[in-house]
From Swiss-Prot:
Interacts with CEP164. Interacts with MCRS1; the interaction is required for recruitment of TTBK2 to the mother centriole. InterPro entries: CK1_Ser-Thr_kinase, Kinase-like_dom_sf, Prot_kinase_dom, Protein_kinase_ATP_BS, TTBK2_STKc. PROSITE patterns: PROTEIN_KINASE_ATP, PROTEIN_KINASE_DOM. The keyword Kinase applies. Residues 674-694, 1052-1088, 1116-1244 are annotated as: Disordered. It comes from Homo sapiens (Human). PANTHER family: CASEIN KINASE-RELATED. Keywords: ATP-binding, Cell projection, Cilium, Cilium biogenesis/degradation, Cytoplasm, Cytoskeleton, Kinase, Neurodegeneration, Nucleotide-binding, Nucleus, Phosphoprotein, Serine/threonine-protein kinase, Spinocerebellar ataxia, Transferase. It is linked to Spinocerebellar ataxia 11: Spinocerebellar ataxia is a clinically and genetically heterogeneous group of cerebellar disorders. Patients show progressive incoordination of gait and often poor coordination of hands, speech and eye movements, due to degeneration of the cerebellum with variable involvement of the brainstem and spinal cord. SCA11 is an autosomal dominant cerebellar ataxia (ADCA). It is a relatively benign, late-onset, slowly progressive neurologic disorder. This is Tau-tubulin kinase 2. One of its GO terms (molecular function) is ATP binding. Pfam families: Pkinase. It is an enzyme of class 2 (transferase).
């Protein structure tokens, strides 16, 4: 039938077949043949004429005729009218039906059916399946497009089974089940095929029931986890790994019986149809469904007549290019191998013959099932009326064909169009939005309504459509229940999938960032929730309304979304999964790092969702308990390789590494994948705007980013400041992190503009990740955090804290991390964005703006000074960025050194840092809880924290033992200390002020010290972080900054030399990184200090016990101890051959950095390759620089350690440059660790 039919119509309008059926129009066509609307000249009724070419290799109509004849007299089966053949074609004539279920579902505003409609349709479909099984045949292609509603008032509420072309007889002449074949070719439609079909096993009766189950889920959710995946093998793999019980949450509870039963069946076992029918009956009773209730597509017109609403003119059967769009039985086209069916098994007497045309002898037309006899022509074709009304009614979604997995080429004919022979009455004024009726129907039954509501709120297990449907439902709920979400959603909440995001959904192409559908959110369908693809609003949690707006990550800005989409296009498919497009709303869940990890998938999904929607609600469970959403996301991760890659490793370490390798790639240097980074940041970007609301949700995001995405997210965050107030905050953070580094970050941020806004809290997470990761991670963390700060700018909390001190620390740690690990180097590459000085300068300007905004709250002058310094550092960093581009890993190391160097410069620019500190302190006051939470997340991931060699060793030790449990414990410990952290933040604020007055060198040292330890310390406590910062600053400056120091020394950009005690610098830095209460609230220094202490504990301890003990110490000691810890901890990263923290920043600048002395701090962090290349090498050589797996040491006197670290850093710098750098790194690890941690904290 595909022979001549594909190019030229087999029949033309006006042709008379067998001198009885006059062709009126073509209503469908596909691989199997064509379907025509014909007029029966004998009965004067419209019929469906299905034709296949006689030259077609696989003859399908023989089986169709055989089965159709066997089924005559059964309910839900079209009336057979006639058949025949000639030299040109074979044909079958049957009763013409109305719209198919696939088209009807897509016509709904949400792309879903209510429970009421789903249950009644499901029961009818089950009856039709039982009917075909009763005659010894399997349908083998059960799907929505193969079921259609009747055309006339008497039949419009009856569902008819269509398309028996793939049927197979499973019984022999004796009625016994035929033995199964060892290998049977795949038959059916990929989306709805059973696992047996994918395994090429002989299909049995239970396989038709599995397809029914998938249909029911799609009816309720709007999509399946593998909806957009066309590859048969991939879909089969997903189905095998997917926990189908996750789908039950969308169905009535009774369907657990349905699933259990079909799961227990095999080829030979006869299904208990009575049991399955009782499931539908009981559910109908439970939800108060009334059989006479109108279906979702039916509405009551003004005249009281029942009208069916249709939104598309697509053929009745869309699957496999099904031409039976108007309910033409067996009208489904068969694509590809579907034609390879054993039609030769048709009984010999089932041949097509003209003699069989006509009504069977002895059977009056009136007695035929569904036959109304001659009066039928007088009956109104309800579907034609619907079509007429359709012309005057614009439906929100009409994406009929795209949804069918096999409908690559939809039937060209419009089966939905009114038949030429049937009367058409236009009653557009009568039709009402079909959305109203479902609502009324819901209100009729409390149970039904509640179920619908629950289904709406709950997240989809794995599918794009699942997610979309849930998202859409959530959108409604969100608009009603979440004002905070609505602003950013704009109408569509995006959810990082349970993925994200339930990774299974990731497999869905819809979940994939959908490079093919980057503008899906803009499409009318997506705007509607996507008739076929987009049900953007999805709340994984069944109690979405219970979630605070804080728990939602929202993207308010179209610009951000556009940027995100742009970024998605690049990294969309790299990190995203097919489910990226699927918008899903994740609620912030108080969950363990594992939960957050689970949410990585959701973020991937979020990327897609964000692409789809300008406004996305990203609610991830940062620290909340794991929920079904997170579980779903986990499933998605498992099912979605793409999603997994996007999220990288579920574990913090793998995540960080993956991000470093791929998404991390920033703009200028050969970074892993800018696209992936951008996509990640893009998703975060959506989350970032809601940052104010969602600090915790951001944590999971950070985890997602931690390997590489975190970096990209961080980079994006820094880039964010240019794009808005949030970005300004980011800029402030970045300024403090390292002016040189900041420009690079800004560049990357610009490229990843969207990510930051989505990453308000995620930035913080990234910061922690950054700590865990080598320098780049740190930088990314900083960026993310700063992005979060952006949102907090309005809050007046987070931004300043990170920008002033954390920035420098971040830079140092980044270099440190880069030295430690190659992956981290890729992360560091994100900082490499610096090469674009202009962009960096712009970023600095933005940062300046943000800083001024934040500092206006605290210390505007300092911020301004810092901004200026940042600009200088940007220049330096640009040159270093070039170096980094030349060397990814070495570049990252160089970035660390550069970062440290930049930190030194920043210290010179203490006034600016002071401003940043001021801003940070305010930010700390503004959102200490979120920041703390984010840090706690990082604590769990501290293993990824880039640390000096020693620090890495200790970090690895503590990290591996701490792992999820320790991280969770740390998180728990951290949360109780939020108040303390807040107090610490206040203390840090004052400390930041001290930093501003302190010499640049001290600041630089502090920053250098902070980087490695900062991640873990940051995770632990703000206070410990501060302590670690001072220690780390010294050690990190010594090791990390040693090259950076030389660079910073070389950097020609003059920087104000304001000396600040290392303790002060560290504590201020820490305070910057600590979450602050919302703007207007007094800063809480103690809380920050407590957090820093935690971080310090993480950084300094080699084991979990050490971490905990240190954490306790930090909590006890207060902000002073964190400061000292920072000094001690600051690992002497090879990049910090710089003089002790007190030494001027310039000395820190290494000769290699001299060309970029002004922007060296940035350069060292972002692009060590050029000026910080020696640093980069050092990083490579020194594991702690690359990454500190174990928390950097938090112990040690801050000043002494700093000095030691600096000294150590100098040798380390040389060592890093040389082969001995690794040794130096390890040697300096102890001292630098503390410093590195503070840097991490600061970066946060």
């Amino acid at each position: 039938m595909s022979g001549g039919g594909e190019q030229l119509d087999i029949l033309s309008v006006g042709i008379l077949v067998k001198e009885r059926w006059k062709v009126l129009r073509k209503i469908g066509g596909g691989g199997f043949g064509e379907i025509y609307d014909a007029l029966d000249m004998l009965t004067r009724e419209n019929v469906a004429l299905k034709v296949e070419s006689a030259q077609q290799p696989k003859q399908v109509l023989k089986m169709e005729v055989a089965v159709l004849k066997k089924l005559q007299g059964k309910d839900h089966v079209c009336r057979f009218i006639g058949c025949g053949r000639n030299d040109r074609f074979n044909y079958v004539v049957m009763q013409l039906q109305g719209r198919n279920l696939a088209d009807l579902r897509r016509s709904q505003s949400r792309g879903t059916f209510t429970i009421s409609t789903t249950l009644r349709l499901g029961r009818q479909i089950l009856e039709s399946i039982e009917s075909i099984h009763s005659v010894g045949f399997l349908h083998r292609d059960i799907k929505p497009s193969n079921f259609a509603m009747g055309r006339f008032p008497s039949t419009c509420r009856k569902c008819y089974m269509l398309d028996f072309g793939l049927a197979r007889q499973f019984t022999n002449s004796c009625g016994d089940v035929r033995p199964p074949r060892a290998v049977a070719g795949f038959r059916g439609t990929v989306r709805y095929a059973s696992i047996n079909a994918h395994r090429n096993r002989e299909m049995g009766r239970h396989d038709d029931l599995w397809s029914l189950f998938y249909m029911l889920v799609e009816f309720v959710v709007g999509q399946l986890p593998w909806r957009k995946i066309k590859d048969k093998e991939q879909v089969g793999s997903i189905k095998e790994r997917y926990d189908h019980r996750l789908m039950l949450k969308h169905l009535p509870p009774e369907f657990s019986i349905f699933l259990d039963h079909i799961s227990s069946l095999d080829y030979f076992t006869k299904p208990d149809y009575q049991l399955l029918t009782s499931v539908f009956d009981n559910s109908i009773k439970t939800f108060g469904v009334i059989e006479s209730d109108p279906f979702d597509w039916e509405k009551t017109g003004n005249d009281g007549s029942l009208t069916t609403t249709t939104t598309s003119t697509t053929p009745q059967l869309h699957t496999r290019l099904t031409p039976a769009a108007i309910g033409i039985a067996n009208a489904t086209p068969i694509p590809g191998d579907l034609l390879r069916e054993n039609t030769d098994e048709v009984f010999p007497d089932e041949q097509l013959s003209d003699g069989e045309n006509g009504i069977p002898v002895g059977v009056s037309p009136d007695k035929l099932p569904g036959s109304l006899g001659h009066p039928r022509p007088q009956e109104k074709d309800v579907w034609e009326e619907m079509d007429a009304n359709k012309n005057k009614i614009k439906l929100g979604i009409c994406k009929a064909a795209t949804e069918e997995e096999n409908s690559h080429g939809q039937a060209n004919g419009l089966l939905n169009a009114p038949s030429l022979g049937s009367p058409i009455r236009v009653r557009s004024e009568i039709t009402q939005p079909d959305r109203d009726i479902p609502l009324v129907r819901k209100l009729r039954s409390i149970h039904s309504f509640e179920l619908e509501k629950r289904l709406t709120l709950e997240p989809k297990p794995d599918t794009d459509k699942f997610l979309e449907t849930c998202l859409e439902k959530m959108q409604k709920d969100t608009s009603a229940g979440k004002e905070s979400i609505l602003p950013a959603l704009l109408h569509k909440p995006c959810v990082p999938a349970v993925s994200r995001t339930d990774h299974i959904w990731h497999y869905d192409e819809e979940y994939l960032p959908d490079a093919s559908k980057p503008a899906s959110a803009n499409t009318p369908e997506q705007a509607d929730g996507g008739g076929s693809n987009g049900f953007i609003a999805v709340n994984l949690s069944s109690c979405k309304q219970e979630i605070d707006s804080k728990e939602w990550v929202i993207v308010d800005k179209e610009q951000d979304l556009q940027d995100f989409r742009t970024n998605e296009a690049v990294g969309h498919k790299t990190t995203g999964s097919p489910s990226d497009e699927e918008p899903e709303v994740l609620q912030v869940l108080e969950a363990s790092p594992q939960d957050e990890k689970l949410q990585l998938g959701p973020w991937a999904e979020n990327d897609h969702l964000k692409k789809e929607t300008s406004g996305v609600v990203l609610a991830l469970s940062a620290e909340g308990p794991p929920t079904a959403a997170s579980e779903q996301y986990t499933d998605r991760l498992e099912l979605q390789p793409g999603a997994a890659s996007q999220f990288i490793a579920a574990t913090p370490t793998s995540l960080m590494e993956a991000q470093a390798e791929g998404p991390l790639t920033a703009i200028t240097i050969p970074r892993p994948s800018v696209a992936s980074t951008q996509s990640t940041s893009g998703s975060f970007h959506c989350g970032q705007q809601p940052e104010k609301k969602d600090l915790q949700p951001m944590e999971p995001t950070v985890e997602l980013y931690s390997p590489r995405e975190n970096f990209s997210g961080l980079v994006v965050t820094e880039g964010e400041p240019p794009s808005g107030g949030s970005r300004t905050d980011l800029g402030l953070q970045i300024d403090h992190i390292g002016h040189d580094m900041l420009p690079n970050i800004r560049e990357s941020n610009k490229s990843q503009d969207l990510g930051p806004k989505e990453l308000p809290d995620h930035n913080r997470l990234v910061v922690r990740e950054f700590e865990n990761l080598p320098g780049e991670t740190e930088e990314k963390s900083i960026l993310l955090e700063s992005d979060n700060e952006d949102e907090k700018l309005s809050r007046g909390q987070h931004c300043i804290e990170i920008s002033s001190l954390p920035g420098d620390l971040v830079i140092v740690e980044k270099d440190h991390s880069a030295t430690t690990e190659p992956l981290d180097v890729t992360k560091t590459q994100t900082f490499s964005v610096v090469p674009n000085q202009d962009k960096n300068n712009e970023i600095m300007k933005l940062l300046t703006v943000g800083t001024s905004e934040i500092s206006s709250r605290d210390i505007d002058p300092h911020v301004e000074g810092q901004i200026g310094q940042v600009a200088e550092m940007q220049k330096n960093k640009i040159s270093k960025d070039d170096d980094i581009m030349s060397e990814d890993l070495p570049g990252h190391q160089g970035d660390l050194s550069t970062f440290l160097h930049q930190e030194g410069k920043r210290e010179k620019i203490t006034p600016r840092n002071g401003e940043l500190f001021h801003c940070v302190s305010e930010n700390e006051h503004g959102a200490p809880t979120r920041k703390d939470m984010v840090r706690s997340s990082f604590v769990t991931r501290h293993s990824r924290i880039p640390v000096l060699a020693q620090e890495i060793d200790s970090t690895l030790e503590s990290s591996s033992p701490v792992s999820a449990k320790e991280k969770l414990l740390q998180k728990k410990a951290y949360q109780p200390d939020l108040v303390k952290l807040l107090v610490e933040k206040r203390q840090f604020k004052s400390f930041l002020g001290d930093l501003s007055s302190a010499s640049d060198k001290l600041l630089e040292e502090k920053l250098a010290t902070v980087p490695a330890p900062f991640c873990e310390e940051e995770v632990l406590t703000p206070f410990s972080r501060l302590t670690v910062d001072s220690h780390l600053s010294r050690s990190a400056e010594d090791s990390f900054l040693s090259p950076i120091i030389s660079q910073s020394r070389k950097s020609k950009i003059p920087r104000p030399v304001s000396w600040v005690n290392t303790d002060q610098v560290n504590s201020s830095t820490s305070s910057q990184f600590f979450p602050r209460p919302p703007p207007g609230k007094p800063p809480t220094r103690p809380g920050v200090e407590a957090r820093l202490r935690r971080y310090k504990v993480l950084g300094s301890s080699n084991s979990d016990s050490d971490l905990f003990s240190r954490l306790a110490q930090i909590l006890q000691n207060g902000s002073q101890k964190p400061r000292s810890t920072t000094q001690c901890k600051s690992p002497g990263s090879p990049h910090n051959p710089k003089t002790p923290p007190k030494s001027p920043v310039v000395p820190r600048r290494s000769p290699s950095a001299s060309p970029r002395s002004s922007s060296l701090p940035r350069t060292s962090s972002s692009s060590p390759s050029r000026a910080g290349r020696p640093h980069h090498d050092q990083r490579s050589s020194s594991p702690h620089l690359g990454r500190s797996k174990s928390p950097p040491s938090h112990s040690g006197s801050s000043s002494s350690r700093r000095s030691c670290q600096q000294e150590h850093c100098k040798p380390s710098k040389n060592g890093l440059k040389g082969s001995g750098s690794l040794h130096h790194h390890s040697a300096s690890t102890k001292t630098p660790q503390g410093k590195s941690k503070p840097a991490s904290k600061l970066s946060r």
